[in-house]
């Protein structure tokens, strides 16, 4: 992850993040992904970004903005779509995000939602980190902070949806190095609490657990503290939010974490 103190560096966020991603290629050659948080000039509390993924983008993304507007009763001018390879960012009024998500299930059932929020965009695909970064032109992106991940699959299949980051809450995401041993029991409990899952990946369970805790009123720090008691296994998490990110390791701390701070 990378958080910029120096606002003049925000236009370079994508370049810096892509370089970090490529450097980690040997660690995770199966798939790669990033979450990038838009700079202050791009973020508006009156609009929501919904990042989408499709295995057939030339079909699913055609006329999608107009179809969303029609199905939700919005004016066409309130909806816009920016396509980037297999992903697209749908911009809608913030108060309509939930309606749009429900609409997408009906009008584009094969489209998957990567993230929702005012600032976050998530891009992830199967392939070497350099290839993924080039497909989405990551080096051209700007932002305040970002998180990347290169994957070597251990808990689930090598798929786009199994790649990291995972997002289970507004402007939230999580990447993970390690393996959870109680993710199936936690998944069942969270499902009973109304949480929906897209994959059988253990990392999605960790992300959903933290989101659920925060929706119940916990701060990010409090949610991470609870996770030390409730999440079994070995792990290092980087958790992104609208304002920054947090890092936590399991009590045994067998997975490394390297952190550094500069004036920039």
Enumerate the language-model features and the residues they cover:
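Conserved short alpha-helical segments that host acidic/polar catalytic motifs at enzyme active sites
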Residues: 1-264
């Amino acid at each position: 992850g990378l958080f910029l103190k120096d606002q003049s560096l925000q236009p370079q966020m994508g370049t810096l993040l892509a370089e970090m991603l490529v450097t980690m290629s040997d660690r995770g050659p199966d798939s790669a992904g990033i979450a990038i948080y838009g700079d202050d000039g791009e973020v508006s509390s009156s609009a929501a970004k919904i990042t989408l993924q499709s295995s057939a983008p030339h079909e699913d993304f055609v006329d999608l903005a107009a179809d969303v507007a029609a199905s939700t009763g919005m004016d066409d001018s309130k909806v816009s779509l920016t396509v980037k390879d297999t992903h697209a960012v749908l911009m809608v009024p913030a108060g309509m995000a939930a309606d749009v998500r429900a609409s997408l299930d009906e009008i584009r059932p094969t489209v998957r939602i990567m993230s929702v929020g005012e600032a976050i965009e998530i891009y992830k695909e199967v392939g070497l980190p350099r290839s993924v970064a080039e497909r989405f032109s990551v080096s051209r992106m700007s932002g305040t902070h970002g998180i990347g991940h290169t994957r070597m699959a251990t808990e689930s299949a090598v798929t786009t949806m199994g790649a990291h980051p995972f997002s289970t809450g507004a402007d939230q995401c999580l990447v993970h190095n390690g393996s959870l041993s109680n993710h199936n029991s936690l998944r069942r409990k969270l499902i009973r609490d109304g949480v929906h899952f897209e994959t059988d990946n253990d990392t999605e369970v960790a992300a959903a657990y933290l989101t659920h805790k925060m929706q119940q009123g916990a701060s990010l720090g409090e949610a991470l503290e609870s996770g030390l008691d409730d999440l079994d296994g070995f792990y290092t998490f980087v958790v992104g939010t609208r304002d920054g990110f947090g890092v936590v390791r399991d009590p045994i701390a067998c997975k490394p974490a390297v952190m550094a701070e500069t004036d920039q």
